[in-house]
């Protein structure tokens, strides 16, 4: 599975309220405004050093990436195996405020991170061995290519049917003024139904995550309720505009 693989046909899970037609109503042309204010790109040398650090920390063992959101449906590495897995003590949360990518300064969006508490069912992917450094570098560039985000990568224990493994994951335990923790689901839905940036909308992000989790037999209770609420919000917005 590679980042260049063709997108699979969109087949929403049975009973899903948030459809591709509703998602299409949230997509708007937006300019690329560059990185979030105050963020600075890692240099090529810094990315290489960081990739080497994580390569060394894997101690020659298979290196697994724990995916719980967009890395499931849009990875930027070459995987040779995957398994369902559970990270205990963490849960998905739309808590990262974004004014770029899938949000804008006028209508900030929310992206997912892992916050403390509960459990998170996701998928672990094993990186290809022969160019491990390059594979790690690719995923670091995608996930934390800014100096301010370096601390957002961490190792977590993930439980699988084949046993427990140590996996690298991203945006676990974020802190700071950009974090909006414990928002009510209806407030999150209000934001996701409206926010859009140059790479797409927050509703699109939610839709892709829910349908790909379902392909692995994972139904996150909060995300499932959230997609219902976002669908209702989108319908309400367009009824008002009609």
Question: Which functions belong to the PLM regions below?
Answer:
Residues 2-242:
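A glycine-rich, hydrophobic/aromatic-adjacent loop/helix-cap motif
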């Amino acid at each position: 599975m590679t980042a260049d693989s063709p997108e699979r046909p969109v087949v929403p899970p049975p009973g899903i309220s948030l459809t591709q037609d509703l998602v299409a109503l949230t997509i708007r042309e937006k300019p690329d405004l560059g990185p979030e204010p105050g963020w600075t790109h890692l240099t090529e040398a810094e990315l290489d050093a960081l990739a080497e650090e994580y390569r060394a920390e894997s101690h020659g063992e298979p290196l697994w990436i724990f995916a719980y959101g967009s890395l499931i449906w849009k990875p930027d590495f070459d995987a040779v195996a995957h398994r369902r897995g559970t990270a205990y003590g963490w849960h998905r949360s739309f808590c990262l405020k974004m004014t770029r990518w899938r949000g804008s300064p006028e209508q900030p969006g929310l992206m997912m991170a892992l916050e403390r508490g509960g459990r998170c069912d996701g998928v672990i992917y094993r990186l290809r061995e022969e160019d491990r450094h390059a594979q790690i570098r690719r995923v670091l560039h995608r996930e934390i290519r800014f100096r301010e985000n370096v601390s957002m990568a961490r190792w977590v224990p993930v439980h699988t049917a084949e046993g427990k493994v140590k996996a690298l994951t991203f945006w676990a335990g974020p802190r700071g003024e950009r974090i909006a923790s414990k928002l009510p689901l209806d407030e999150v839905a209000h934001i996701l139904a409206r926010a859009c940036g140059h790479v797409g909308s927050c509703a699109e992000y939610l839709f892709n995550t829910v349908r790909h989790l379902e392909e692995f037999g994972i139904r996150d209770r909060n995300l499932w309720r959230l997609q219902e609420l976002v669908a209702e919000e989108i319908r309400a917005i367009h009824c008002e505009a009609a």
